[in-house]
Structures are given as structure tokens and as C-alpha cells.
């Protein structure tokens, strides 16, 4: 919805096609927009008809927008696979696209980290919204000196977190969106086990809503190598934990995935923090220090690198992508100045 707001502020009309899995949030946001428009009109303002429209439907509706010549700019949020299909199709008609794609986000816990702060940051980033944020934490690299003291504390947090109806007070973990998300989680955990990973959690939970409700305990996987499912984004609460002993090794592992959305480091070493934020460090579009990778950093440019797509929303430059830019030169005199002082005399 923030993409739609940016486009509107820049003077565009907007057609919003939400995921077919989450139509109600789009309709709710659109209803709020309708109330704002009505208030503006009641006070004498004028709003063009059809300024904002919500289209509810499946993939075929999205494909119409992708291919339509009257959609000069398409902002798409989704998987990397979706971006691979959408980007070239929009470009083939010389349209523009902003792609916000998959994220396999990581955090590094160094030997100097404040472990109390780190525990809270990791727990929220990895378990919040049942791991269904594009910026959810999915990989964790923990220094050898603090691994054996920190990971048991993290497991305790995983074991104690409440799973159930998110509308009830006290529940922190709600359901997965559907069976496909549950199957993806279980498949990733099976692959991790086959790769000698130690899985803690990940079981299905009966929250009293029947067999079509997919509540699960968040999973923590201790694994020696970053291969297989660790290199992919699984949109579910799975946190892969890898031990490291050298800071350069942690940076190499951190960057050794195709995605590049969000990242973080927990450290009290200024040099490590500065390196992480430099060209030698995180190769992601978002890099944080002593706070997790998740959240809506509305004040800063939001987006990633590599297979995350390179698009940016929010922040001070967000408006640029939603405007058609033109360079204008106006001559108010009676002489004709030419570029670079060129002389071109004719009679």
C-alpha cells in the first residue's frame, strides 16, 4: 500500500492488484482512501474519478497490467521468480518497472555483541509475523566465543513463544498464509535434516481452527554449511544458524547468496560495524547495526540488490521513480545561444 501512496503523491492514478492470497488488506486500505477522498470532496475539493482502483483476481489480472501499454510504470512485490517473468515483459514494451523481490536476510552476532539486546532483536526478526515478511531474518552467523551461551537462550525463547490466534492477547505467532507455505516450510526442514542440520521446532500446532489453518512453531536449524535450503528464501519461520570464528568468514557467508535485501550486525566493535556498512561488508540494500533486518524502514530507501531486484521505495528519493522527468530549456531573449558556444550563422 505504501507504493500506491507514493504514486498518488506524485500525481499518478493507481491500479492496485494485491496478491490473491491477501485481498482483504487491500480492500481495507482502499476503503480508508475512499473515506479520505469523501472528506476532501465534502470540503469542496475535486478528485478525478478512478484515481485509485483495486483489482481483485488471480495471475491473469496481473498479466494484463504487465502487458498493458497504458501502464507506463509497474511496481511489483513478490518472489524472484515473479520478477524474472515480469521485468522482461514490461521492458519488452519499453515500460518501466520497480521490482521488490525475495530476501534471504542474515544477521551476524560478533563476540562483542550485547547478547540481551541481540536476543530480543533476533527473536522478533526471525519469528515475528511467522517469518512472512520480506525482511524476516532467515540466516544467523554466531561467533564461536558466544555461540554456546547464546544459542541455548535463543532456543528457550523459541520454545516459550506463544502460537495461536493473533487477535487474542498474548499470542505472538499467527498462522502461515496457506497450505503451500506450510508445505514449503516442511520441505525446507526435510532438506536441512538431510544435510545433517539439527532442527529445533517446526511442528504444526492445533490452534482450534480446523485442518485448513496452518499454525506452526518457528523452527531453528543448527547447520554446519550454507548449502541447499539455506541459500533459498522460504517464506516461513525458519532460522538457519551457523557458527563462525573469523569476521571475514562471516562476511563471506553473509554475502554468498543470490538475494540482497536486508542485513544486520550485532556488535560493540566500531571497526566491525563500519566494515559491515562499507563496500567490504554487507552487499544488501539495507544494512543495520544492533537492530534486526526486519521492519518497514519508512524513513529510508527500501529495497535490495542482486536477485532482490534493485528497486527502491520510500525514503527521500522514492518520488523520483514515480515521475516522468523532463529537461526544459527556455530562451527569454532575442538572441539564440547554442550549446557549448557553437556558432551557426545563416542568412
Predicted regions and their residues:
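Gly/Ser/Thr-rich beta-alpha loop segments that engage phosphate groups in nucleotides
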Residues: 13, 59, 80-81, 85, ...
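Residue-level detector of anion-binding/catalytic polar loops
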Residues: 13, 96, 198, 260-262
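ALDH superfamily catalytic-core signature
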Residues: 35-36, 67, 81-225, 252, ...
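Residues that line or immediately flank small-molecule/substrate-binding pockets and catalytic motifs
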Residues: 56-59, 78, 144, 268, ...
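Rossmann-like NAD(P) dinucleotide-binding subdomain of oxidoreductase/dehydrogenase enzymes
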Residues: 1-117, 244
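Short, solvent-exposed loop/turn segments at the edges of secondary structure
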Residues: 2, 9, 101-104, 133-135, ...
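Glycosyltransferase donor-binding loop in the core domain
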Residues: 21, 141, 177-180, 239-242, ...
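Conserved C-terminal structural/oligomerization subdomain of aldehyde/semialdehyde dehydrogenase
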Residues: 42, 46, 71, 108, ...
Amino acid at each position: 500500500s505504501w507504493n500506491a501512496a507514493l504514486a498518488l503523491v506524485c500525481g499518478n492514478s493507481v491500479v492496485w492488484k494485491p496478491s490473491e492470497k491477501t485481498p482483504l488488506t487491500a480492500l481495507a486500505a482502499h476503503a480508508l482512501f475512499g473515506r479520505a477522498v469523501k472528506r476532501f470532496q465534502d470540503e469542496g475539493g475535486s478528485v478525478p474519478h478512478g484515481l485509485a482502483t483495486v483489482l481483485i483476481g488471480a495471475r491473469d489480472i496481473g498479466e494484463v497490467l504487465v502487458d498493458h501499454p497504458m501502464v507506463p510504470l509497474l511496481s511489483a512485490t513478490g518472489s524472484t521468480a515473479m520478477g524474472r517473468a515480469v521485468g522482461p515483459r514490461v521492458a519488452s514494451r519499453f515500460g518501466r518497472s520497480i521490482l521488490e523481490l525475495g530476501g534471504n536476510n542474515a544477521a551476524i552476532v560478533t563476540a562483542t555483541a550485547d547478547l540481551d539486546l541481540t536476543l530480543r532483536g533476533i527473536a522478533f526478526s526471525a519469528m515475528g509475523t511467522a517469518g512472512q515478511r520480506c525482511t524476516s531474518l532467515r540466516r544467523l552467523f554466531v561467533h564461536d566465543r558466544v555461540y554456546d551461551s547464546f544459542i541455548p537462550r535463543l532456543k528457550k525463547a523459541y520454545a516459550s513463544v506463544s502460537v495461536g490466534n493473533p487477535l487474542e492477547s498474548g499470542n505472538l505467532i499467527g498462522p502461515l498464509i496457506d497450505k503451500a507455505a506450510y508445505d514449503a516450510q516442511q520441505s525446507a526442514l526435510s532438506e536441512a535434516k538431510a544435510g545433517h542440520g539439527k532442527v529445533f521446532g517446526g511442528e504444526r500446532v492445533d490452534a482450534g481452527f480446523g485442518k485448513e489453518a496452518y499454525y506452526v512453531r518457528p523452527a531453528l536449524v543448527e547447520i554446519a554449511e550454507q548449502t541447499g535450503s539455506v541459500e533459498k528464501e522460504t517464506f516461513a519461520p525458519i532460522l538457519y544458524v551457523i557458527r563462525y570464528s573469523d569476521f571475514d568468514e562471516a562476511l563471506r557467508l553473509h554475502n554468498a547468496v543470490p538475494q540482497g535485501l536486508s542485513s544486520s550486525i550485532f556488535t560493540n566493535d566500531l571497526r566491525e560495524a563500519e566494515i559491515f556498512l562499507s563496500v567490504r561488508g554487507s552487499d544488501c540494500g539495507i544494512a543495520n547495526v544492533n537492530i534486526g533486518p526486519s521492519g518497514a524502514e519508512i524513513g529510508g530507501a527500501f529495497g535490495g540488490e542482486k536477485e532482490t531486484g534493485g528497486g527502491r521505495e520510500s525514503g527521500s528519493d522514492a518520488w523520483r521513480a514515480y515521475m516522468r522527468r523532463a529537461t526544459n530549456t527556455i530562451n527569454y531573449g532575442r538572441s539564440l545561444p547554442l550549446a557549448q558556444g557553437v556558432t551557426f550563422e545563416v542568412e
